[in-house]
Curated annotation (Swiss-Prot):
Domains (record comment): The N-terminus has three domains that function to attach the appendages to the phage, digest the cell wall teichoic acids, and bind irreversibly to the host. The C-terminus is an autochaperone that aids trimerization.
Keywords assigned by UniProt, alphabetized: ATP-binding, Degradation of host cell envelope components during virus entry, Host-virus interaction, Late protein, Magnesium, Metal-binding, Nucleotide-binding, Repeat, Viral attachment to host adhesion receptor, Viral attachment to host cell, Viral tail fiber protein, Viral tail protein, Virion, Virus entry into host cell
GO biological process: adhesion receptor-mediated virion attachment to host cell; symbiont entry into host cell via disruption of host cell envelope
Cofactors demanded by this protein: Mg(2+)
Name of this protein: Preneck appendage protein
Modification comment: Autocleaved to produce the 74 kDa gp12* assembly attached to the phage particles. Autocleavage of the C-terminus is a posttrimerization event that is followed by an ATP-dependent release.
Subcellular localization(s) per the UniProt record: Virion
Function: Structural component of the 12 appendages that hang from the lower collar. Adhesion protein that binds to the host cell surface during virus attachment and mediates teichoic acids degradation.
Binding site for ATP: 746-795
Annotated site residues (Cleavage) in this chain: 691-692
Subunit structure and binding partners: Homotrimer. Each appendage is a homotrimer of gp12*.
């Protein structure tokens, strides 16, 4: 007897049934590897399997050699026969089969034909009931009712279009082709991969959609947890291609803000395709924590609200990545019905929309009109890297709805970061390309590029009116012949920021403006335009060279500052300036503060404007109190009073109203604007080398009296003086002071007392400031045109005091007195002749002398 061989104990090696599950050969499906790397991995893995197999054969040969050489052949035969008779051999076979089933069972094992004719529903049901992973091989497997998926189901096919599961023509209404078993409370742990679901909607006739609720979709997942759907194709769907929803056959409508019970959650949909659907390709309702990536939804059967991807009522925390849509109403529609909560907290990371009507459509129906309640749930959408190609409505979706690249309605908290819209046929979209409308709020559009929409009215339009959008930021936009109005803002939009807009409009049909706003308070900066006749139109005013507008607190070129009001500014300043009230500002100053509205400090230090309408310029340590007070080049001074101004001064304090003051450590001069008075502490000088004091008098005959004639009074008016008459003065052109001109209005415009003094009344301003002003004469008509006395021929400047040029005859001598004949001075006893400047000329009939009139 030979020695019993030392047999080697082999460890079990990995599952290798690549024909069933890619998970048994994971490297072949590792998308990070190149094709060559995948093939090398597979060859290496198979070589390892071959080594193990060869070793098994060698060890088995050792056993057989031992049996034969030691005469154990008969004993082995007897043992095998006994096992067979006792049933142990059958048990071994069954055990092996059961172990093989762990790798998966084929529906054909349970009688499925896959011939496109035979009803294979029972084979599917038995295979699924076995509890083992189920494999659907090549073929078309007809079913007479929907396939139910219990928890812990694994269903894998030979690939899209290779393994096809299809409704038979005899199937009635209300059936979904595949759905989880417990439609109310749901199931868990379902894995679906690599087959086609054909709803065979043609069996129902043309134009047929779902009968209601979530019924009649190709794949319905209701109230399920942990579902993985990969490489599934849904075609010819009565309702949806793939529908992820909550428990129940009917979608719940519990009101805005009310979440439905039993949501589906932790759902993964990858590399799937939907086409020929009656409603939506891939859709979600009342579910959460969903990922949809690398899917394609296209070409629906019908023309209603047929969306490629629809994130609908009550969906939340959904991420869509790198998907594609074509020929649908909405490429991606994120929405809700009026009596359901809106989808919220949705993220879109890359999408390509080709020839959809509205590539990206975000809305909460029933919350758009001014009389509708504001949506409480339509919030938080972030979408990046969106592509829209040739949006159009050639098929007439939704009663010929107008195409859009993007439409946002009723949502708030929407962020678009990277959106490109392109068309090569400008006639496909002629209204608005991108719209924020119907009470949408707090939306941000950044990085938008539109090209080719040359017949469109608006590139980007924030629609105004009673149900318009608001709080919109539009930035970094490039418009290439897209929109007669590049960016347009409607009426009533209170909060909008428009920055860095670049537009070319030389290929547009009648371009108007790159940016247009109805209201006057937008924030605008960084506009660049070619081909638009107007760069910016704001509240009806055109700006052809660009425009920059800022709202809110503003600080620039300032190292530090205190509080700045939302309607205040600080520029070019240092050391803790504050503009803490509305409509106030500080320029190129330090340690200064505005504490009342409509106040300004510029070029100053340690100054404060505490009253409204105050101004401080070029001053140090200046304070302006009350209203309309100001200091200009006035340091260590305080202007207290209404309409009080200090100029070029140091160390003075002023009170009162409607005054202009100046001085050094004390007030030295004052202009009283209210009463027209001038005060000075020292000398007031004139500009002429000889000056006189004069008043206006009216001529008796209304005619002009020429310069240099002596005049007398006659009936309160003047005429040329004659010999022996009282001379009151001379017609003068050298007066340093002239009274009685009535320069600005009729001398009777205000009431006067019997002594000619002005009658005053006390008035109080809206801000409570009291002051006196002249009482208007009720007979005065301010609408009548007034001509001052200086422009009327009958009024003359009569020098009454001073050194005045007088017409003389040949009798007048220097140092002697004068009298008058016909207004010409002759020898006499009045006044004194200072000097004769022009000797008497017989031809002219007079000379000229300077006479001291007093």
């Amino acid at each position: 007897m030979s020695t019993k061989p030392e047999l080697k104990r082999f460890e079990q090696f990995g599952e290798i049934m690549v024909q069933l599950y890619e998970r048994y050969l994971p490297t072949a499906f590792d998308e990070s590897l190149t094709l060559l790397e995948k093939m090398n991995k597979i060859i290496h893995y198979l070589n390892e399997i071959g080594k193990v197999t060869n070793e098994l054969i060698e060890e088995w040969n050792k056993v057989m050699e031992w049996i034969l050489n030691d005469g154990l052949e008969d004993l082995v035969k007897e043992t095998l026969e006994r096992w067979y008779e006792e049933g142990k051999f059958a048990d071994l076979v069954i055990q092996v089969i059961d172990e093989l089933k762990q790798f998966g069972v084929s529906v054909k094992t349970y009688g499925a034909k896959g011939d496109g004719v035979t009803d294979d529903i029972k084979a599917f049901e038995k295979a699924i009931e076995s509890g083992f992973p189920v494999y659907v091989p090549y073929g078309t497997f007809m079913v007479s009712r929907g396939i139910k998926l219990p928890s812990n189901t694994v269903l894998t096919g030979a690939g899209k279009r290779n393994a096809v599961i299809k409704f038979m023509d005899s199937v009635g209404r209300g059936e979904s082709l595949m759905y989880n078993e417990n439609v109310t409370t749901g199931n868990e742990n379902i894995f679906l991969s690599s087959f086609t679901l054909d709803g065979n909607n043609k069996r129902l006739g043309q134009g047929i959609s779902g009968i209601g609720g979530s019924r009649e979709s190709n794949l319905s997942i209701r109230a399920c947890h942990n579902v993985y759907i990969r490489d599934i194709e849904a075609v010819d769907c009565t309702l949806h291609g793939i529908d992820i929803t909550c428990g129940g056959l009917d979608y719940p409508y519990l009101g805005d803000g009310t979440t439905a019970p039993n949501p589906s959650e932790n759902i993964w949909i990858e590399n799937c395709e939907a086409t020929g659907f009656g409603d939506d390709g891939i859709t979600t309702h009342h579910s959460q924590y969903i990922n949809i990536l690398n899917c394609y939804s296209h070409d629906p059967r019908l023309t209603a609200n047929c969306n490629g991807f629809e994130i609908d009522d009550g969906s939340r925390h959904v991420v869509l990545s790198n998907n594609r849509s074509k020929g649908c109403y909405g490429g991606i529609e994120i929405k809700a019905h009026g009596d359901a909560p809106a989808a919220y907290n949705i993220s879109v990371n890359g999408h390509m929309s080709v020839e959809d009507v509205r590539s990206y459509n975000f809305r909460h129906i029933g919350h758009h009109a001014a009389t509708d309640p504001q949506s409480v749930s339509a919030k938080n959408i972030v979408a990046s890297n969106l592509v829209s190609i040739r949006p159009n409505n050639k098929r007439g979706f939704q009663d010929n709805a107008t195409p859009r690249v993007l439409a946002v309605s009723a949502y708030y908290g929407v962020v678009i970061n990277g959106l490109t819209g392109y068309t090569d046929d400008p006639n496909l979209l002629t209204e608005t390309v991108v719209s924020v409308q119907f009470r949408a709020r707090n939306c941000s559009l950044n990085g938008v590029a539109l090209t080719g929409f040359s017949n469109s009215e608006n590139g980007i339009y924030v629609i105004g009116g009673s149900r318009g959008g608001d709080a919109v930021n539009i930035s970094n936009v490039t418009l290439n012949n897209s929109g007669r109005y590049g960016v347009s803002i409607g009426s009533g939009i209170e909060n909008v920021s428009i920055t860095n807009i670049s537009g070319i409009g030389d290929g547009i049909n009648s371009p108007v403006a790159l940016v247009s706003t109805i209201n006057s308070n937008p924030e605008i900066s960084g506009l660049s335009s070619i081909g638009y006749p107007t760069v910016a139109r704001v509240a009806g005013t055109d700006y052809n060279d660009g425009l920059t507008l800022f709202n809110g607190a503003f600080r620039a070129s300032t190292t530090s500052s205190g509080k700045i009001h939302s309607e205040g500014f600080i520029m070019g300043s240092t050391s803790g300036c504050e503009a803490s009230v509305s409509k106030s500002g500080i320029l190129t100053s330090s340690s200064s503060k505005t504490s009342s509205e409509r106040s300004l400090i510029a070029g100053s230090s340690t100054s404060e404007a505490t009253g409204t309408y105050n101004t401080i310029l070029g001053s140090l340590g200046a304070v302006a109190d009350e209203q309309f007070a100001g200091l200009i080049s006035a340091s260590q001074s305080r202007a207290s009073g209404n309409h009080n101004l200090i100029l070029s001064s140091y160390g003075i304090n002023t009170v009162g109203s409607y005054k202009v003051n100046g001085g050094f450590e004390k007030i030295n001069w004052e202009l009283d604007s209210l009463n027209g008075r001038i005060k000075a502490r020292d000398t007031v000088t004139g500009g002429n080398t000889w000056s006189d004091f004069a008043e206006y008098f009216e001529s008796l005959d209304g005619q002009v009296i020429e310069t240099g004639y002596l005049v007398t009074l006659d009936k309160g008016k003047i005429r040329k003086a004659e010999k022996g008459e009282k001379i009151i003065g001379v017609i003068s052109e050298t007066a340093g002071f002239v009274l009685g001109e009535s320069s600005f209005e009729w001398q009777g415009a205000v009431l006067k007392n019997e002594f000619g003094g002005i009658v005053y009344e006390e008035v109080t301003t809206e801000d409570g400031v009291k002051f006196k002003r002249p009482l208007p004469n009720p007979d005065f008509d301010p609408n009548k045109n007034y001509i001052p006395r200086s422009q009327r021929r009958e009024w003359h400047v009569v020098g009454l005091l001073g050194q005045i040029a007088v017409r003389i005859d040949d009798t007048v001598k220097q140092g002697q007195g004068i009298d008058a004949v016909g207004g010409v001075a002759t020898d006499g006893n009045n006044f004194i002749v200072k000097e004769i400047t022009t000797p008497y000329n017989k031809e002219k009939g007079y000379g000229v002398a300077i006479v001291l009139i007093k």
